[in-house]
Regions:
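Short glycine/proline- and charge-enriched loop/turn segments
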Residues: 24-33, 173
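Short intrinsically disordered, low-complexity coil segments enriched in acidic
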Residues: 1-8, 133, 150, 192-193
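Active-site rim elements
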Residues: 33-37, 109-113, 178-182
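Glycine-rich FAD pyrophosphate-binding loop
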Residues: 2-25
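Mobile amphipathic helical/loop "lid" adjacent to a hydrophobic cofactor/ligand pocket
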Residues: 30, 41-168
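Helical element adjacent to the flavin cofactor pocket in flavoenzyme catalytic cores
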Residues: 164-194
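Conserved donor sugar-nucleotide recognition element shared by glycan-biosynthetic enzymes
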Residues: 18-19, 158-159, 187
Length: 194
């Protein structure tokens, strides 16, 4: 803030809000972020400009999603077709295949269907006619991982806001995401510079 006076107000005893790095590992020398983990240049231009101004070191990061549900009886990932069918028995599992069909339907139709600002995610799933496997083994775990929210609360989220987030972060596409980055040394590195 070369031309402005800035006052930081923080409720906690430390600065950073959800940017929290803890040291882990056998020697306690491995930084692990527990809140703010990744960002991309497409969706966070102000943050990335601040990082550039402050000289915050960043590195590319891989972001993918995988799920292990029902005590490991059903597992899959989204990084590749091989990951989707990590358990080859799912190739012949009609419920798993319907879940994949519902993923494609959701990705294709959610943006147009979620125009009503009063619609919840639960209402959106009903309107799209997706099945319980899609809800329980795809959307709820994915959304819960993104927002660190218990699965039982996701269905009450406003559909339009969540679907816009998915669209902005290329989560409604099966052709790829934005390149993700992380702060080298953990988010504490940018908090120290602020």
């Amino acid at each position: 803030a070369a031309t402005h006076d800035v006052t930081l107000i923080e409720a906690a005893g430390r600065l950073g809000g959800h940017a929290r790095t803890v040291m882990a590992g056998k020697r306690g020398d491995q930084p692990v972020d527990t809140g703010f983990i990744v960002f991309n240049y497409a969706n966070y231009p102000q943050l990335t400009a601040m990082f550039d101004d402050l000289g915050v070191p960043v590195v590319k990061s891989d972001m993918s999603f995988g799920a292990s549900v029902m005590g490991g009886r059903m597992e899959y990932g989204l990084a590749s077709l091989r990951a989707v069918f990590a358990q080859t028995r799912n190739i012949a599992n009609p419920r798993f295949l319907r879940m994949l069909r519902d993923v494609m339907r959701f990705n294709a139709r959610a943006l147009d269907t979620a125009q009503d600002s009063n619609m919840t995610i639960g209402g959106l799933l009903e309107a799209l006619g997706t099945g319980p496997w899609f809800r329980d083994y795809y959307l709820l775990p994915l959304s819960g991982a993104i927002w660190s929210t218990p699965k039982d609360r996701i269905l009450d989220f406003p559909a339009d806001a969540m679907i816009r987030f998915f669209e902005n972060h290329a989560l409604l596409s099966h052709t790829g995401q934005h390149q993700w980055y992380t702060v080298q040394g953990g988010s504490i590195e940018y908090v120290r510079r602020v």
